[in-house]
Amino acid sequence: MKVFSRKNALLLAALLIALAAACAFALSRAQTAVMLEETAFAPDAERDAMTVSLEATEDLRTIKGEMRLTATNRTGGDFSEIVLRAYANAIQPGSVTLSDAKVNGERASIGADSDDPSVWRIETPWRAGETAEVCWRVSLIVPRGEGAIGRTDESALLIGALPTPAMWENGAWRTDGYDELVGTSYGQAMDVRMTLTVPNGVQAAFGGAWVGARDNGDGTRTLTMQLSGAREISLALRTKGAMRQTTVDGVLVTALAQNARTASRLLDIAADALEDIGQLGLAYPFPSLTVAQAKTARADGAVGSALIAVDADAKTDALLSRVTRLCARQIFGVQVENDPWNAPWLSETPASCVELLAYRRREGEAAYEKRFYGEIEIATRLTRPRGVTIGASTERFGGDGEMTQVLRDAGAAGLMGIEQAVGQAAFLGALQRYVEQNAGGFGTLEAFEAALEQATGSDWSGYLADMLAS
């Protein structure tokens, strides 16, 4: 009979330890969702709050329920109406129906504009400084197709599909026509708490953290989720698939994908992206991040509050770059919002700079220069149609590919020119100042210029003017 040697015994012990570690790792990323211990929101004098109670059908086609908004009129003027945006109706008319509106417990008239069904108006007097309790019933038939709002046979992505208040700017409600290049997350920061009832076979992930779950004993379960500082409501659903979770520097990361392997891959890449951003001294703004596998018809993917959606088919390096940019857009574009029709470069361009700086830190100067001059700087030397510039409104761009090339690549090349002139520390200091001074609000070119001047001691307004116009 063959006897184990000491060497074989040690190898066997090492194998058993590795197996136990692998099992523990698998259990740590099991399908049972990790709950964050967060208390219910307290009233906030600076932010409105929304409570949502929804039910989803097993085929992901229909979502319905009640939405309740507690909002204060901080504009200084009196209103005769409250305007909501329901962008799913711009994608597929009739997708969203609102009914049974009440303001402070009294019934109110509600209806959609005849020429733009994504614009809904609740008629009610709303005086300056007054806080109103507004509620309505909502029924959403999720449009079929790819995009930030859409569904397939096995999944649904809802970034800004549910109605939220329109922006009030310059004495009027913003009711710009839907633009697929703009996205659907333009709104005041608010605190959202949602309960979602789904069939047991349906996986759900919210742009925010799960704080509770209940088995209803009837083949459904009710999930409770919340997020402070959301610009819209973002949600991803799957009838088949896998969910994996981990924690990175206190941020709960959730990946929802078509299978366990893809979910684990997205989770690892998102964790690397958050670590890279943190090592640059920039803080991810939310306690949670959801990464959803989805085809969004966008080069990088789609962004909602604390949720990103990305196609997982790319190679690892390319996917890491995309996810890093999308995570950085949680800072530039959600935490600091900007006018997505007329100043989209304030989100995509600085996010691209963050990704390039992370790439240089990770791969080294030689690899960075090869990529920068081979892929990024070349965008500044390409001929484009008249008016298609970094500073142009979205109506100038012919499609997502053109907009990506101009905003992400040519724009990043321009800003990285400033970084080369002042050094990484000063440039990152400017980005940090810009975020700190505008967090929860809205960024502008003037605010960006001011942050650059404060951090570098130089006036870059002329440089930026030339960059935006060229």
Where are these regions (language model features)?
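N-terminal, polar/Ser/Thr-rich
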Residues: 8-64
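Surface-exposed beta-strand/loop patches in extracellular or lumenal glycoproteins
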Residues: 70-92, 179-184, 188-199, 446
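Zn2+-dependent metallopeptidase catalytic core
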Residues: 74, 190-203, 225-230, 258-289, ...
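A surface-exposed beta-strand-loop module
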Residues: 90-155, 219
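Extended, low-hydrophobicity, Ser/Thr/Pro/Gly-biased non-transmembrane segments
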Residues: 137-234, 240
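Juxtacatalytic substrate-recognition/specificity segment
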Residues: 194, 242-343
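Post-HExxH zinc-binding segment in Zn-dependent metallohydrolases
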Residues: 273, 277, 306-313, 343-387, ...
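Amphipathic alpha-helical substructures
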Residues: 366-368, 403-470
